[in-house]
Design a protein with these regions (language model features):
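Bacterial N-terminal signal peptides that target proteins for export
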Residues: 1-16
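Subset-of-secretome marker
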Residues: 29-272
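C-terminal motif of bacterial Sec signal peptides marking the signal peptidase cleavage site
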Residues: 24-27
Length: 272
């Protein structure tokens, strides 16, 4: 016959075992509500990439290294419509806008000098003491309209000061198109960011801006964070070359506005 003392000891042992089991399960982390955490790491990355592409909009902000160049992004991508924001490559700032197939770029003085040196007449005066006009931004972002100016028609007329108050239009048939358009395509941009990531391992969970995510770790401090609740969105990437990319504002309304026609210079005319 069991004594009351024996029953108490057994009950305490069972309670301790139960508490230990709960602690172990908590340490393993939950699989989340969207099931992505149960997949292989390769499948998780592919699912997150598809989620970025499927989103009606996404704001990508941060920096990384690509082809030896330091790239800083602040872009809002809109599904099937285009993108708006800024790209800085090795201290050269470019304001980028794509509406449908048409890409418009506006840069700082260094950017225009490089364009003029390649295609135009670099003898023209450069602006002094004036801030670089700001290209169109997504709604809710600061932006200033440039002073209207007729677009130049021949390379000899193209000067830094003339170009800096205009937008360069780059069409799908122009040689430079893919370079800029790839930055506004969600799948191409994510693949560029993820380039060189290599193999990844599951490395626990982390809360990213209030959303529970699974952490995938790789070489050179690479980290990929994917939401395990709700949509399996890509939330943050620490690429192997250094830097951090944040994926924000999924499915938030974004308005894209084309620049005034009078303020557009066709890059094809400069290259003639």
């Amino acid at each position: 016959m069991r004594t009351s003392r024996g029953i108490a000891v057994r009950a305490n042992a069972l309670a301790l075992a139960a508490a230990t089991a709960v602690a172990v399960l908590a340490g393993c982390g939950s699989t989340g509500k969207n099931g992505v955490a149960t997949k292989s790491t390769g499948a998780i990355v592919a699912t997150a990439e598809d989620a970025v592409v499927a989103a009606s909009s996404v704001h990508i902000q941060g920096q990384f290294t690509s082809g030896g160049e330091h790239v800083v992004l602040d872009l809002r991508l809109v599904k099937d419509k285009g993108a708006s924001g800024t790209v800085t490559i090795d201290d050269e700032v470019i304001e980028l806008l794509r509406i449908g197939p048409d890409v418009y770029v506006k840069g700082d003085e260094q950017f225009y000098r490089s364009v003029v040196a390649r295609f135009g007449d670099a003898t023209g005066p450069s602006p002094s003491g004036s801030a670089t006009p700001t290209a169109p931004h997504a709604s809710g972002s600061p932006g200033a309209s440039a002073t209207p100016k007729s677009s130049a028609s021949t390379p000899g007329d193209i000067t830094v000061s003339a170009m800096q108050v205009n937008y360069l239009h780059i069409g799908p048939t122009d040689a430079q198109y893919q370079t800029f358009a790839s930055l506004t395509d969600p799948r191409q941009l994510v693949q560029q960011i993820m380039q060189g990531v290599g193999s990844l391992d599951k490395d626990g969970q982390k809360d990213i801006r209030g959303t529970k995510s699974i952490v995938l770790s790789g070489k050179k401090d690479t980290r990929v964070y994917v939401a395990i609740d709700g949509s399996p969105w890509l939330l943050r990437v620490l690429p192997p070359g250094g830097g951090t990319l944040e994926f924000l504002d999924y499915d938030k309304p974004v308005t894209l506005n084309p620049p005034p026609a009078a303020q557009v210079v066709d890059i094809a005319k400069i290259m003639k």
